[in-house]
């Protein structure tokens, strides 16, 4: 009997142990990401050829305590390596694990390599050569908790590589993961009609067909690790291989299970057909190009096993939620009597099915943790003759309070916005506390920003509520799901405003009181335009005619554009970010504004103010400043707190202000308190103008910002 370890992805251990038991292996013991077992050589060959779940089979040569480099060397040296491979063979060592005396895996691999070549030399043979790539013999060593395991890779390249895949589609499913889905769903134990409406490159269906047709998954592999092993029994291996070929030929002819696969992408369907042809099972599978929502259930009952899309891409969440909701509705109404098994990495998406799972399991698709849920669709939920739900499905049972509120808001604001001459505005701002989001309309696009929930609310609850919001939105306000962008907003921490979110760009041009601005709905946390400052920007424009205007912490320069369009004599735009200054220049160009009177300055605004305050010639007639509530950017020398530092800030700004000049000072600190007493002593006059600067779409949230008009006393 020989000792082996079958490696597999995390979560496969139970299924793999069951498979090894069915093969007839003994002394089976589950471990992390694999299973130990013993088997005679012939059975080990059979397991290597027939396992559908293992990623790798290794022959365990030595396992024992190891507490020093000397013990590691001795453990490897005591093995009779010449009985395993010839010195004419090349070898390599994969070492895993650190701790104690092993600081890095390279050290461990080097010790074992030295022991192997020394043993060959001491036995009177020339040393074998090490090959980093494509070695004849691959040694696997694992060090964990003071125990060293030295093994030989028996199976060769990863066993999930069956040999039938020509190329991969986007986000391919590994073959042994597909096989485990078939095992854990219960389908393998009783093969019956199988449907995959998101078949992609066909992996689930091909693996199922291989099972039903009694085809060994390793039959098309061109290479195995034991081929250069000195104890390899070629005759026994040939016999097992020929038996598998005969079973495959007979199995395809006898297979009466029906397989159906479809995908909306014709290129993937063509690829699935090629893969099935390579695997020898194309004649068993009916592939077609189709939208999953239009796929009819085959006659009778069966299994629907699939790995639907669960994009990690920002902005696709709402569209996917709609898809999952409509799938759940379709399953309930058209697939009565069927069993459904679905792999998905996103709990929000799979919960949007609105189906109660019989069983929930955890699987890993590579490093991605996924839920694998099983559902039984009761027979009384029979097929209906009405068409499938359209994209803007009425889902009044989902978040009705939110849906009714935003529908009402949208109706009121649409006419107002048209009259105002704006096409970007806020529709909803956590009006109902349970639905803690802000919803903004930018032309025909919607941006949903999730506020951070209190720690007292369970994460599962907040996720479900957000999911319901995204499901309800399209029908409530008549927007296409793919035009909904999702963002998560937290309490501002220093440089959050400047953090890039996504390489993709969804850019639009919005109009505001005649001014045009570029928006980027996906690139950053903010879109390029603070909607709550709309009236403040217009006020700046109205006050700018013939004046020298300074815009500090300018962001994308929207207030500067209003000033220029308002007839400013000059406009100086200052911001720390080159990215946003470039954006500001684009906004000027959009409005056909150019000339030397428009200056753009990249600088730490606080330091720029300090330096300019010393320059008696630097005078401005109108200053607009909207500083961050708090900032500790690496590019700014000091931290800034608007409550703590506003007196000092305004004291410096007043030195830049002409005798009849005005400062429009705004910030977003909700409990901001202006120190009017100290400022009065400094001969600075302060007037709150919140009533003039709060737009109608923000009346529900009057504390969104506070704005002040400041002059010389």
From Swiss-Prot:
<dbReference type="InterPro" id="IPR054170">
    <property type="entry name" value="RlmL_1st"/>
</dbReference>
<dbReference type="InterPro" id="IPR004114">
    <property type="entry name" value="THUMP_dom"/>
</dbReference>
<dbReference type="InterPro" id="IPR029063">
    <property type="entry name" value="SAM-dependent_MTases_sf"/>
</dbReference>
<dbReference type="GO" id="GO:0005737">
    <property type="term" value="C:cytoplasm"/>
</dbReference>
<dbReference type="Pfam" id="PF10672">
    <property type="entry name" value="Methyltrans_SAM"/>
</dbReference>
<dbReference type="InterPro" id="IPR017244">
    <property type="entry name" value="23SrRNA_methyltr_KL"/>
</dbReference>
<dbReference type="GO" id="GO:0003723">
    <property type="term" value="F:RNA binding"/>
</dbReference>
<feature type="domain" description="THUMP">
    <location>
        <begin position="43"/>
        <end position="154"/>
    </location>
</feature>
<keyword id="KW-0698">rRNA processing</keyword>
<keyword id="KW-0808">Transferase</keyword>
<dbReference type="GO" id="GO:0070043">
    <property type="term" value="F:rRNA (guanine-N7-)-methyltransferase activity"/>
</dbReference>
<keyword id="KW-0694">RNA-binding</keyword>
<keyword id="KW-0489">Methyltransferase</keyword>
<dbReference type="InterPro" id="IPR019614">
    <property type="entry name" value="SAM-dep_methyl-trfase"/>
</dbReference>
<dbReference type="InterPro" id="IPR000241">
    <property type="entry name" value="RlmKL-like_Mtase"/>
</dbReference>
<dbReference type="GO" id="GO:0052915">
    <property type="term" value="F:23S rRNA (guanine(2445)-N(2))-methyltransferase activity"/>
</dbReference>
<dbReference type="Pfam" id="PF01170">
    <property type="entry name" value="UPF0020"/>
</dbReference>
<keyword id="KW-0949">S-adenosyl-L-methionine</keyword>
<comment type="function">
    <text>Specifically methylates the guanine in position 2445 (m2G2445) and the guanine in position 2069 (m7G2069) of 23S rRNA.</text>
</comment>
<dbReference type="InterPro" id="IPR053943">
    <property type="entry name" value="RlmKL-like_Mtase_CS"/>
</dbReference>
<protein>
    <recommendedName>
        <fullName>Ribosomal RNA large subunit methyltransferase K/L</fullName>
        <ecNumber>2.1.1.173</ecNumber>
        <ecNumber>2.1.1.264</ecNumber>
    </recommendedName>
</protein>
<comment type="similarity">
    <text>Belongs to the methyltransferase superfamily. RlmKL family.</text>
</comment>
<keyword id="KW-0963">Cytoplasm</keyword>
<dbReference type="Pfam" id="PF22020">
    <property type="entry name" value="RlmL_1st"/>
</dbReference>
<dbReference type="Pfam" id="PF02926">
    <property type="entry name" value="THUMP"/>
</dbReference>
């Amino acid at each position: 009997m020989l000792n082996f370890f079958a490696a597999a992805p995390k979560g496969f251990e139970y299924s793999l142990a069951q498979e090894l038991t069915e093969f007839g292996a003994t002394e089976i013991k589950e471990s992390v990401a694999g299973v130990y077992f013993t088997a005679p050589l012939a059975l080990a060959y059979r397991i290597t050829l027939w396992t559908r779940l293992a990623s790798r089979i290794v022959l365990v040569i030595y396992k024992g305590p190891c507490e020093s480099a000397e013990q590691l060397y001795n453990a490897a040296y005591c093995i009779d390596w010449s009985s395993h491979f010839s010195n004419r063979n090349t070898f390599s060592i994969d070492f895993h694990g650190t701790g104690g005396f092993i600081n890095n895996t390279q050290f461990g691999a080097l010790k074992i390599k030295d022991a192997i070549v020394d043993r060959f030399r001491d036995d009177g043979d020339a040393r074998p050569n090490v090959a980093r790539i494509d070695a004849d013999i691959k040694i696997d060593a694992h060090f964990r908790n003071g125990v060293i395991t030295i093994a030989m890779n028996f199976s060769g390249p990863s066993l999930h590589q069956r040999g039938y895949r020509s190329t991969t589609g986007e986000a391919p499913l590994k073959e042994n993961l597909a096989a485990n889905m078939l095992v854990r769903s219960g389908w393998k134990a009783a093969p019956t009609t199988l449907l995959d409406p998101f078949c992609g490159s066909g992996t689930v269906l091909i693996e199922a067909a291989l099972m039903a047709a009694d085809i060994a998954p390793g039959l098309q592999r061109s290479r195995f690790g034991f081929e250069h092993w000195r104890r390899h029994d070629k005759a026994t291996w040939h016999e097992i291989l020929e038996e598998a070929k005969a079973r495959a030929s007979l199995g395809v002819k006898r297979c009466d299970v029906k397989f159906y696969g479809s995908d909306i992408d014709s290129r993937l369907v063509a690829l699935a057909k090629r893969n099935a042809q390579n695997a020898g099972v194309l004649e068993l599978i009916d592939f077609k190009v189709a939208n999953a929502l239009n796929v009819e259930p085959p006659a009778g009952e069966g299994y629907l096993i699939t790995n639907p899309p669960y994009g990690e891409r920002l902005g696709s969440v709402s569209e996917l939620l709609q898809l999952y909701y409509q799938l759940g509705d379709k399953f309930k109404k058209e697939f009565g009597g069927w069993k459904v098994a679905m792999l998905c990495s996103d709990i929000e998406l799979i919960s949007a099915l609105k189906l109660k799972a019989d069983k929930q399991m955890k699987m890993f698709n590579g490093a991605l943790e996924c839920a694998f849920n099983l559902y039984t669709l009761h027979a009384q939920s029979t097929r209906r003759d009405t068409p499938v739900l359209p994209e803007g499905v009425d889902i009044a049972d989902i978040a009705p309070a939110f849906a009714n509120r935003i529908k009402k808001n949208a109706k009121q604001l649409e006419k107002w916005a048209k009259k105002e001459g704006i096409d970007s505005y806020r529709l909803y701002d956590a009006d109902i506390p349970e639905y803690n989001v802000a919803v903004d309309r930018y032309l025909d696009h919607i941006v949903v920003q999730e506020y951070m929930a209190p720690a007292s609310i369970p994460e599962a609850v907040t996720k479900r509520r957000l999911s319901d919001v995204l499901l309800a939105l399209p029908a409530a306000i008549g927007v296409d799901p793919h035009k909904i962008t999702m963002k998560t907003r937290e309490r501002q921490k220093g440089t959050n405003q400047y953090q890039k979110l996504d390489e993709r760009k969804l850019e639009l041009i919005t109009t505001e009181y005649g001014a045009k601005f570029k928006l980027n709905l996906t690139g950053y946390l903010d879109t390029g335009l603070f909607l709550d400052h709309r009236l403040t920007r217009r006020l700046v424009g109205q006050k700018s005619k013939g004046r020298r205007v300074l815009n500090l912490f300018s962001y994308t320069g929207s207030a500067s554009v209003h000033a220029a369009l308002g007839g400013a004599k000059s406009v100086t735009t200052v911001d720390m970010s080159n990215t946003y200054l470039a954006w500001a220049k684009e906004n000027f160009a959009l409005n056909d504004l150019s000339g030397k009177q428009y200056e753009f300055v990249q600088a730490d605004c606080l330091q720029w103010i300090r330096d300019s305050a010393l320059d008696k010639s630097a005078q401005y007639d109108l200053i607009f400043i909207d500083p961050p509530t708090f900032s500790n950017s690496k590019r700014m020398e000091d931290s800034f707190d608007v409550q703590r530092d506003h007196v000092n800030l305004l004291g410096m700004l007043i030195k830049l202000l002409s005798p009849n000049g005005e400062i429009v000072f705004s910030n977003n600190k909700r409990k901001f308190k202006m120190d009017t007493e100290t400022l009065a002593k400094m001969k600075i006059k302060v007037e709150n103008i919140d009533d003039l600067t709060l737009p109608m779409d923000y009346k529900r949230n009057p504390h969104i910002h506070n704005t002040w008009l400041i002059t010389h006393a």
